[in-house]
Curated annotation (Swiss-Prot):
It comes from Mus musculus (Mouse). The chain crosses the membrane at residues 214-234. Signal peptide: none annotated. This is Immunoglobulin superfamily member 23. One of its GO terms (cellular component) is plasma membrane. SUPFAM superfamilies: Immunoglobulin (SSF48726). PROSITE patterns: IG_LIKE.
Length: 239
């Protein structure tokens, strides 16, 4: 009996300890929740120690911080941005103005025959009045509104263009190429003839019966000539 009484008395402090622990936990939880902001839309932020906050700010997604910013092209795609030198401007490269030619050009080519006339003319309007200069294969060949080739020669076959300059700007004409007609073609060089060797003292030689006949005929002819001369001299003396 004494043992049972002693054991019952020893259980009371354990239950009291559990009750006290539960009361302390509930009071701590209520006090923590009461301190949170109650306004609508407010962000709940828990306090973070200074050292931990520094570590998070420096080590959070390091690969994103090391990556350089991506530049975008005009179409919004990632890549190297374009510059003014890469994008041609139509105002800096105006369309070429065609020339007025005689004979008429076909796809930038004038077909003509040698020793015929070729006329090139460029009618351009600029303010102030421009100075027109012509070039032949990149070399200056004349000035003025017209370029007149009186007799076309092989040396004048090539590309011509005109440049107009004034104090404000410079314009370039459409280049034209002067070429021979397809039917005429380039001037042909005569084929070399075969040369036969010849001896320094080579002459027409006669031998045999033909040589004897030639000598006899020459002798008879000489005698007839001398006889006729003597005959006419005698007749003159008799008179």
């Amino acid at each position: 009996m004494n043992c049972l009484r002693d054991s019952g008395r020893g259980l009371i402090p354990a239950w009291e300890t559990l009750l006290l622990t539960g009361a302390l936990l509930s009071s701590c939880t209520c006090s923590a929740t009461s301190k949170l902001p109650q306004m609508k839309g407010a962000n709940t932020q828990l306090p973070v120690p200074g050292a931990l906050e520094k570590d998070l700010s420096t080590s959070w997604f390091p690969e994103l911080e090391a990556q350089p910013p991506t530049s975008s092209s005009p179409k919004g795609l990632p890549g190297r941005p374009r510059t003014s030198q890469e994008v041609p401007n139509a105002e800096d490269n105006p369309s070429l103005i065609p020339l007025v030619t005689f004979p008429e050009s076909s796809k930038g080519i004038i077909y003509s025959d040698l020793n015929y006339s070729v006329i090139l003319q460029w009618m351009v309007t600029m303010n102030p009045e421009p100075v027109l200069s012509w070039t032949f294969d990149g070399k200056p060949c004349g000035t003025g509104e017209k370029l007149f080739i009186r007799r076309l020669s092989p040396d004048q076959l090539g590309t011509y263009l005109c440049i107009a300059r004034n104090t404000d700007k410079e314009l370039v004409s459409e280049p034209v190429t002067v070429s021979l007609s397809p039917a005429t073609g380039a001037p042909t060089v005569p084929a070399p003839t075969v040369a036969y060797p010849m001896k320094p003292n080579d002459y027409m030689s006669v031998s045999g019966g033909s040589a004897i006949a030639l000598i006899v005929a020459a002798t008879i002819g000489g005698l007839v000539l001398i006889g006729s001369v003597c005959f006419y001299i005698l007749l003159a003396l008799k008179k």
